Amino acid sequence: MEESCLIEVQNLSLCIGDRWLVRDLSFSANQGEFIALVGSSGSGKTTLLRALSGDTPLANGQVITHADCPLPVGMIHQDLQLAEGSTAIKNALSGCLYRHSSLKTFFGFPEEEKKRAVALLQKLGLGQKLNQWTSTLSRGERQRLAIARTLLGQPSILLADEPVASLDGKWAGETLNTLKEYAKDQQACVICSLHDLDQVDQFADTIIQVDPLNHDKWEVKCNPSTKA
């Protein structure tokens, strides 16, 4: 195991009923690494991410994390899970709760946290929406807000389920670049499912792809485009 390793997956297998989704998958993710999960709809990408987060039981194998922080694993879900009756800035700041006591946040978040939240929301194109109710935001804006909230929690292992599925080309690229920068700057790792192969080629350091002829087998390979 490398010293920079944040998560190890050893001989992981997953099944739903009598259908195997994954068999004997092994890989590791290191600090600064961006990993893309690639496969057709229904191939098991979401289930695999939920298994890595601990939300789905394994049929076999193990997942070992080496992160030492208040929020070792953060997950960006497709259903977003935002607080509808709150503003964009308050939703984003809720991601910081893992790093502060409830007593401290009862009196308001520290000023540096507010500045970080505002800067990140501006970067993701939400600078003019800070005090807007979440329920009034578009699907793409809500998706970027959910990403900002998770990043503000500063997880060492960031799992993202189709994080740019609702975004147009410009914001998809900007958002994936933000995730990649986060991995480098915070010495974290990002593992996300993507369906656009151009995005995979541009951003992923490592690609984990389902075998189209043998759907429970997954291939792990380096991306020469980003490793060069």
Question: What are these regions, as identified by a protein language model?
Answer:
Residues 158-161:
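Catalytic Walker B motif of ABC-type/P-loop ATPase nucleotide-binding domains
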Residues 105-129:
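Conserved ABC ATPase "signature" region
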Residues 53:
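Helix-to-loop junction immediately C-terminal to a conserved catalytic motif
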Residues 133-137, 141:
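Conserved ABC ATPase signature
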Residues 169-171:
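Helix N-cap at the start of a conserved alpha-helix in ABC-type nucleotide-binding domains
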Residues 194-195:
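H-loop/switch region of ABC-family ATPase nucleotide-binding domains
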